[in-house]
Amino acid sequence: MENIRNFSIIAHIDHGKSTLADRLISECNAVEDRQMSSQVMDTMDIERERGITIKAQSVRLEYKMNDKKYILNLIDTPGHVDFSYEVSRSLASCEGAILVVDASQGVQAQTIANVYIAIEHNLEIIPVLNKIDLPNADPDRVKNEIEHIIGIDCTDAIEVSAKTGIGIKDLIEAIIKRIPAPKIEPKKPLKAIIYDSWFDNYLGALALIRVYDGEIHKNDEVFIMGTEKKHIVLDLMYPNPISPIKTEKISSGEIGIVVLGLKNVSDVSVGDTITLSNNKANTPIGGFERAKPFVFAGIYPIETDKFEDLRDALNKLKLNDSSISYEPETSLALGFGFRVGFLGLLHMEVIKERLEREFNLNLIATAPTVTYEIYLTNGEMLKIHNPSELPPISNIQMIKEPYSHATIITPAEFLGNLITLLNSRRGIQTKMDYITSDRVLLEYDIPTNEIIMDFYDKLKSGTKGYASFDYEPIDYKQGDLIKLDIKVAGENVDALSIIVPRDKALQKGRDLVKAMKEIVPRQLFEVAIQASIGNKIIARENVRAMGKNVTAKCYGGDITRKRKLLEKQKEGKKRMKSIGKVNLPSEAFLSVLKID
C-alpha cells in the first residue's frame, strides 16, 4: 500500500493541464497507443471544442521504478473559476498536487485560487513549469513569480514540455518521491467518500470513491450514511478514460468506481460516506462542502409543449453535475420553465449548450441574477433570486446584495483601463501589488451582480486578452437597489425585469427600451415600449405601426371618400391597440444581457 500516490493537477486555463495528463497516461501505458487521442481525459465534446476541462476525471496509472511497482491515481481537475468546486472536491481525495504554470505566461489569477485550495487541504505541492520548449519561455522569471505571489519554494521545480515529452520521467519520479503515500487503516471498518457520481446508460448510477479505512469487496452489502439505505455492490472498477478496469476489491488508500445498480444518482450524492451494513463506521467523513449555486437564470423551452422534456433533461444532467439546482417557475411572457442555479456564467453557458445538444431542445435563457436578501418592514427576511418576486417598495426596509472578492493579474500598461472598468462596476479596491515591474496584482470587493453579466468579456477586451481574473463570494452588503420593469404595449414583461442600483436606473432604462425598439417586430398598431420603476415611467420608445395603403383603390375622386377610409383604418387600429398582443422574439430576452 505504501506504493500508492494520489495526486491532482492544478493550473490556470490553457497552461497545458490536459496535455500533461495525456503525456503521463501514455508514459505509463494506461491507454493503448491506438486509442490515445489528445485531451483523452476530456470526454465531452464541449470540453474538446472549447479546450477546457469541465468534469474532473480520474485514471489509475502503473509505473515501475527501481524494480518496484507504483500505483499513481491521477485526478484531472478543471481550471476555470466556475468549476473550482470540482477542484476542491478532487483535492480533498489526494495527498499531493502538481502545480502547472506556463513558463511563458507566468502565474495567473486562477493558479492562485486553486493553489490556496490545495494549501487548505495540506497537500504536498510540486511546482512544474510547462511549455519550456517555447522560444519565449522564461523559467527563472516564472519561478520568482511563484515564490513571490504564492510563497512556494521553487528550487526543486521541474521543467517539462508536455507537448514534446521533455522532463516527464523526472516528474513521475518526483511524484513518487515527494508525494506521501496515503495513510491506511485496512483493519478498521470500511469508510469511503463519494467524490463524484455520474450516470451510465447500462450500469445506472456510478460512484467514484476514495477508500480511507478498510476494504470494499464485490457482493458486499454497503450502507450509505446520508440516505441511510443499503445496497449490494454489483461491480468494482478502477477508473480509466477509455474503459474502466474491473477488480474484486478496492483497499484503503485507493480510488475506484462502485456499481450499485441504482437508477437515481441522488442515492449516491457527492460527499456522502459509504460503510458496510454489518460493520458500520461510527461517523461519516467530514469537511466536505456542497456546491452552492451562485448565479440563477430562467430557462424556458421555445416550444412550450417541451416542458416535460426539459425536466427530464435537467434530471439527467443533475446525475452528472450535482452542483445544478432547479425549480419550476412560470412567466407570463415565456410560459412554463425552470429557475436554474449555476456556479457561474461559463457553467450556465455549458449547461444550456449541453441541454440543447444532448437532448435536442431549443431554449431561451433569461438574464442571470444573484440571490438578494430582502429585509421587510415587518421584520421578516426573504431571499429571492428572481427580480419579479421582489415585494412592493413600500414594504421593503433594505436590500442586501452579495459581494465577491476579485483577484486580477494584468500587465501594467492596462492598469488604467482596468481601474476605470472596476470603478464603473462599483468595485472597492482592497490591494494593489506590483509583482514585477510590468505585472500588477489587483484585489477588489465588487457586487457579484456586476461581474456575472459581461464583465469577463470587458476585462479581456480592455487588456487585449492578457489579464486573468478569479472571484470568490464573500458576504452580503446593503445596496441602494430598485426593480426596473419593462412594459410592452402596456403589459409588464416579467422575464425582462432586473434589479439595478438606483443611480444607474435611468440610463439602464433608456438603453433597454432603445435596444428593445430594434427587436420588437412592427405591428399593425403602434407599440409603446416603456421602462418603469414602480408606477413611474422613466423611459419610452415607440415602434411605429405598419401602414396599409387603404386609399390605393380610390382613383382621383372625392377627398371625403379617402378621408372616410382613413378614419375607418384609424378606428380599427385604436381597437387593435387596446386588445392587440405582441409576440416577443427570443432575441428580446438576450438583448437585456448585452446592455452595458
Swiss-Prot record:
Subcellular location field: Cell inner membrane
Classification lineage: Bacteria, Pseudomonadati, Campylobacterota, Epsilonproteobacteria, Campylobacterales
Chain residues that bind GTP: 14-19, 130-133
Broad class of where this protein is predominantly found: membrane
Descriptive protein name: Elongation factor 4
E.C. no: 3.6.5.n1
Protein family (similarity comment): Belongs to the TRAFAC class translation factor GTPase superfamily. Classic translation factor GTPase family. LepA subfamily.
NCBIfam families xref list: lepA, small_GTP
Protein's GO biological process: positive regulation of translation
Species name: Campylobacter hominis (strain ATCC BAA-381 / DSM 21671 / CCUG 45161 / LMG 19568 / NCTC 13146 / CH001A)
Gene3D superfamilies linked to this entry: 3.30.70.240, Elongation factor 4, C-terminal domain (3.30.70.2570), Elongation Factor G (Translational Gtpase), domain 3 (3.30.70.870), P-loop containing nucleotide triphosphate hydrolases (3.40.50.300), Translation factors (2.40.30.10)
Matches recorded under SUPFAM superfamilies: EF-G C-terminal domain-like, P-loop containing nucleoside triphosphate hydrolases
Pfam families: EFG_C, GTP_EFTU, GTP_EFTU_D2, LepA_C
Stored HAMAP family: LepA
Record-linked PANTHER family: TRANSLATION FACTOR GUF1 HOMOLOG, CHLOROPLASTIC, TRANSLATION FACTOR GUF1-RELATED
Domain called tr-type G: residue spans: 2-183
Protein purpose: Required for accurate and efficient protein synthesis under certain stress conditions. May act as a fidelity factor of the translation reaction, by catalyzing a one-codon backward translocation of tRNAs on improperly translocated ribosomes. Back-translocation proceeds from a post-translocation (POST) complex to a pre-translocation (PRE) complex, thus giving elongation factor G a second chance to translocate the tRNAs correctly. Binds to ribosomes in a GTP-dependent manner.
Disulfide bonds: none
Catalysis: reaction(s): GTP + H2O = GDP + phosphate + H(+)
Entry GO terms, CC: plasma membrane
Membrane-topology descriptor: Peripheral membrane protein
Entries under InterPro entries matching the protein: EF-4, EFG_III/V, EFG_V-like, EFTu-like_2, G_TR_CS, LepA_C_sf, LepA_CTD, LepA_IV
Single Gene Ontology MF annotation: GTPase activity
UniProt keyword list: Cell inner membrane, Cell membrane, GTP-binding, Hydrolase, Membrane, Nucleotide-binding, Protein biosynthesis
